[in-house]
């Protein structure tokens, strides 16, 4: 009999970040930063396609049998907050 251990929340989040970075890389983006934190919050993955376009993401890895879509975990207020937080990132980078 085979028993399967459930992943911990930390393991699931780490797997989600690897999956996201792999997908962004396949789309032609290059990773700039993972798990960037400031006093106001955290961005999980920051990637760039060009010098003028940067993708900032806050990941939510959910273990479920049915996915209800990304809007379930990203209400408009959270999207606005992430956009604001993304604007803080370049000011905190020496090379950007």
Curated annotation (Swiss-Prot):
GO MF, one annotated term: nucleic acid binding
Pfam families, sorted: UPF0102
Domain of life the protein comes from: Bacteria
Transmembrane regions listed in the UniProt entry: none
Coiled-coil zones: none
InterPro entries on file: tRNA_endonuc-like_dom_sf, UPF0102_YraN-like
Family: Belongs to the UPF0102 family.
Listed name of the protein: UPF0102 protein ML1607
Origin species: Mycobacterium leprae (strain TN)
């Amino acid at each position: 009999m085979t028993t399967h251990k459930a992943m911990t929340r930390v393991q699931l989040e780490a797997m989600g970040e690897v999956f996201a970075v792999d997908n962004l890389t396949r789309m032609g983006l290059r990773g700039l930063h993972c798990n960037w934190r400031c006093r106001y919050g955290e961005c999980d993955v920051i990637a760039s396609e060009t010098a003028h376009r940067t993708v900032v993401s806050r990941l939510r890895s959910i273990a479920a049998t049915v996915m209800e879509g990304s809007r379930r975990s990203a209400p408009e207020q959270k999207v606005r907050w992430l956009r604001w937080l993304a604007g803080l990132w370049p000011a905190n980078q020496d090379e950007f």
